[in-house]
Regions:
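Anion-binding and metal-coordination hotspots
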Residues: 1-316
Length: 316
């Protein structure tokens, strides 16, 4: 029964009826995620680095078997969770909501911005990277199943990473009405990266002192390209105190997806972007309805499949 996809079929049947009645515009989508507590006791857990005998009959329940099967099927990430539940190991130990940590899953909603109809629901562990990754899955599934492809996508800063913005702009031709995740402001009192002009034709930056920053073109492990100034240029520069006071020269890391990020930044002051920022509240209302009206702030079913079925049924 769990592998039948029945709840997905029911959800999509209801969505198809909503589309038939004209309740789905398909012009703009919004995406967000919210933590839902797992049915797992905070006291029944072990340290992620501890060895655990999952074959013990007292421990090897269905959620545990699902968890082990998922581990076998996935590629190792190289990181261990801080704490693992013995009753629902697929849930994630998190304190992101504030207060004491607890085991949780993330409910992910993709909604249409016209009247807030939920177009897709996905369940992930309570990790921001997985929440962002499932966005691609839901957008592609909605396009494949219903032929719906938005012109714009509204989301918060967590979805504004360079790979995500580039995927939306370059592969899907969707306007990212998303604040770009940017750490280039720099320290207070020093020139931010925006003070440097990028010369695309010559592939170099020009600093406020009119000196050039060059690159070897090598891509780092962070998917950035480093541009560096010449030490002699900086040594005699009158602006060094407000640029690189503690280093011989200035270094700028430029993302390989910077053009897509620049495009996303250019949308920030457009009327459509500002309207999307207001409309995005509809997805937050969906989560408020889930938790306050339906009272689903804690799951009843365990395991990823149980959590997915329960949240999909609630979204129907």
């Amino acid at each position: 029964f769990r592998d039948s996809g029945l709840f997905r079929h029911v959800f999509e049947t209801v969505l198809a009826r909503c589309m038939k009645e004209g309740l789905v515009g398909g012009e703009g989508f919004a995406i967000d995620a919210s933590l839902i507590k797992a049915d797992a006791n905070r006291q029944r857990g072990v340290c992620g680095s501890d060895a655990t005998d999952w074959t013990d009959p007292k421990v090897a329940t269905r959620p545990v078997r699902e968890y082990l099967a998922a581990l076998d099927a996935s590629e190792p990430t190289g990181t261990q969770p801080k704490n693992i539940s013995l009753t629902d190991p697929a849930s994630r130990w998190t304190s992101a909501a504030g207060g004491p940590a607890f085991y949780a899953y993330s409910a992910n909603y993709l909604i249409d911005l016209d009247v807030g109809i939920i177009l897709d629901s996905g369940t992930t562990t309570a990790r921001r990277t997985e929440e962002v990754e499932t966005t691609r899955t839901m957008i592609e599934r909605t396009e494949e199943r219903f032929g719906l492809k938005p012109g714009r996508l509204a989301a918060d800063t967590a979805y504004g990473s360079a790979p995500m913005v580039a995927w939306l702009v370059e592969e899907k031709a969707i306007e990212p009405h998303i604040p770009v995740w940017d750490k280039s402001a720099g320290k207070e009192g020093l020139f931010p990266r925006s003070a440097f002009t990028f010369d695309k034709a010559r592939n170099r930056y020009i600093c406020p002192g009119s000196h050039e920053l060059h690159t070897t073109g090598r891509i780092t492990s962070d998917n950035t390209i480093l541009y560096r100034s010449r030490t002699p240029d900086c040594a005699g520069c009158a602006l060094k105190a407000t640029c690189c006071p503690n280093t011989p020269g200035r270094k700028i890391a430029r993302s390989i997806h910077e053009e897509a990020r620049d495009y996303a930044r250019s949308l920030r002051d457009t009327p459509a972007y500002l309207q999307s920022r207001k409309d995005r509240k509809k997805v937050e209302m969906s989560f408020a309805h889930l938790k306050r009206i339906l009272k689903l702030d804690r799951l009843r079913l365990r395991g990823m499949s149980g959590a997915n079925d329960e949240l999909l049924l609630a979204a129907t």
